[in-house]
């Protein structure tokens, strides 16, 4: 009789999708991304990478203030879910990106301008558009508990995706 752990070891993992967090981001808000790989939004580059990845890219991050970003969103929105992130975008630019077809915000509050009473930025634009989902890293490091509670009141539970950010800040090695 085979043990459960032996059965697991004989099966291979299957990659079901890739989250493309870069290279189409703002150099100013690149976060932990390697600056050598930051690139202006480029639909043909995306398609080459998508082909090399056997079509596994499911989400592609873009900073909408970058030159060519709106055209990029228009071009790829039918091929991949476009998410706004690593951005210096103001409210109007983010709103325009959502109108062009971006449907998500990666790492809400992180690597983007803060939400203020006179400059609501990406956060305010996302809140105003019912078609936009937002991701939050609720690890006790990235967001204050009050920010998490307030976000649930702003967006509602059906528009929030809870994620981890598996990188060095979690206290674990890459991988």
PLM regions: where:
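Histidine/acidic-residue-rich, glycine-tolerant segments that coordinate divalent metal ions
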Residues: 2-120, 171
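Active-site-adjacent C-terminal substructures of enzyme catalytic domains
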Residues: 93-175
């Amino acid at each position: 009789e085979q043990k459960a752990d032996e059965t697991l070891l004989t099966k291979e993992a299957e990659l079901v999708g890739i989250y493309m967090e870069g290279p189409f981001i703002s150099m100013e808000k690149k976060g932990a991304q390697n600056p050598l790989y930051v690139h202006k939004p480029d639909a043909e580059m995306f398609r080459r990478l998508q082909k090399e990845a056997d079509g596994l890219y499911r989400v592609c991050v873009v900073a909408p203030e970058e030159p060519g970003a709106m055209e990029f969103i228009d071009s790829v929105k039918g091929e991949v879910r476009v998410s706004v992130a690593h951005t210096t975008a103001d409210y109007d630019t983010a709103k325009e990106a959502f109108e062009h077809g971006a449907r998500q915000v990666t790492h809400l509050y992180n690597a983007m301008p803060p939400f203020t009473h006179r400059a609501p930025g990406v956060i305010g634009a996302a809140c105003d558009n019912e078609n936009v989902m937002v991701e939050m890293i609720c690890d006790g490091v990235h967001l204050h508990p009050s920010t998490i509670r307030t976000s649930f009141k702003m967006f509602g539970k059906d528009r929030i995706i809870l994620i981890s950010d598996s990188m060095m800040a979690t206290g674990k090695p890459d991988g």
